[in-house]
């Protein structure tokens, strides 16, 4: 039986952002762009599902991953219709998973987000935080700044 050469189906494989490599904070350096999830919904009146946002964004991003589908491997700037060179991005982009926040009180979850973002800042890596609700903004910005926020 021949080996399958088609891209992985969306539901197969390790679910990472755009099928990027999985990493830990200890693996990061200034060249890396880290994707990090904060699945939390403590700041909304009723549980509305914002804690599922990091997973949903990863699931959707698989359609646009470098290895997911050859037709999306070379994105085009639609305003000027020129190809965008993403060849360097694949080596830089890593997914470090979600901050474990489930079941934590709001104050403890905020501290966990702040501590994780502080560790990311110390690694000098750039980061994209995929959220839950808007309560992730203040601890993320506070940890990323060098003074009071």
Model-based region annotation:
Residues 2-149:
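Metal-dependent C-N hydrolase catalytic cores
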């Amino acid at each position: 039986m021949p080996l399958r050469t088609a891209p992985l189906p969306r539901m197969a494989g390790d679910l990472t952002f755009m099928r990027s490599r999985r990493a830990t904070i200890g693996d990061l350096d200034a060249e890396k762009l880290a994707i990090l999830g904060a699945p939390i919904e403590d700041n909304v009146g009723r549980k509305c599902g914002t804690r599922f946002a990091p997973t949903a964004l990863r699931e959707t991003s698989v359609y646009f991953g470098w290895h997911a589908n050859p037709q999306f491997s070379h994105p085009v700037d639609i305003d000027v219709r020129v190809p965008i060179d993403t060849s360097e991005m694949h080596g830089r982009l890593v997914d470090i998973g979600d901050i474990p926040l489930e079941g934590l009180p709001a104050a403890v979850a905020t501290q966990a987000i702040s501590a994780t973002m502080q560790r990311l800042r110390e690694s000098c890596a750039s980061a994209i935080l995929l959220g839950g609700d808007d309560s992730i903004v203040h601890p993320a910005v506070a940890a990323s700044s060098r003074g009071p926020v």
